[in-house]
A protein has these predicted regions:
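Mid-domain beta-loop-alpha active-site segment that forms a flexible
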Residues: 97-102, 144-176
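Rossmann-like NAD(P)H-binding beta-loop-alpha module
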Residues: 40-41, 47-48, 54, 58-63, ...
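N-terminal glycine-/serine-/threonine-rich beta1-alpha1-beta2 phosphate-ribose binding loop
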Residues: 1-51
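Predominant activation on well-ordered alpha-helical scaffold segments within soluble catalytic domains
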Residues: 15, 33, 58, 83, ...
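Short beta->alpha connector loops at strand-helix junctions that form conserved
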Residues: 6, 70-72
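Short, acidic/turn-prone active-site loops that include or flank metal/cofactor-
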Residues: 29-32, 72-75, 98-100
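Alpha-helix N-cap/helix-start capping motif
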Residues: 8, 29, 79-80, 97, ...
């Protein structure tokens, strides 16, 4: 088993955290792109933030690895390319993140039933009841005050502004 992280600065911390497990640890962009092509690997979980997941996903597809997709940005920036390559290399793409995984699981075995509509729900974000006047004064700090999670600034801002929901809509369109 292997774990690969893009940020080399966190290599020693990760190595220490996993020292009691029989896991090989690699770090760096080149390591990610190379490990996805390794012979003993059947499934590649792509869970990298933003655009960083694109190149490793392409290389994994070209190496005929099943893609367990947890990175919606890969499809947002290059969905047509990823879909074309997956068909060309006969590589399955299995969504493993939240709504898209649930949709995928509901559709297994439903090949004869064409999809008419997929509905993605949204809470409206933390500012859904704000007036236009209140919205004019919202700050980054306000958007980062999520009551339920601490997942980092990018995902918190993307969720608060509903950008993440927009990404999910694009992902659903490409996947289904």
């Amino acid at each position: 088993d292997s774990v690969v992280i893009a940020n080399e600065a966190h290599y020693n911390k990760l190595k220490e955290a996993l020292k009691d497990f029989p896991i090989k640890i690699y770090a760096g962009e080149n390591a990610i792109s190379e490990i996805v092509e390794a012979a003993p690997i059947d499934i590649v979980v792509t869970a990298m933030v933003g655009y960083s997941g694109l190149k490793p996903t392409i290389r994994a597809i070209e190496a005929h690895k099943t893609i367990a997709l947890a990175n919606k940005e890969t499809l947002v920036v290059a969905g047509d390319l990823i879909k074309r390559l997956a068909l060309e290399y006969r590589t399955p793409i299995i969504p493993v993140d939240s709504e898209h995984s649930a949709i995928f699981q509901c559709l297994v075995g439903e090949g004869d039933n064409p999809i008419e509509k997929i509905i993605l729900t949204a809470s409206g974000g933390p500012f859904r009841k704000f007036t236009a006047e209140q919205m004019a004064h919202v700050t980054k700090s306000d958007a980062l005050k999520h009551p339920k999670w601490h997942m980092g600034h990018k995902i918190t801002i993307d969720s608060a502004t509903l950008m993440n929901k927009g990404f999910e809509m694009i992902e659903a369109k490409i996947l289904f």
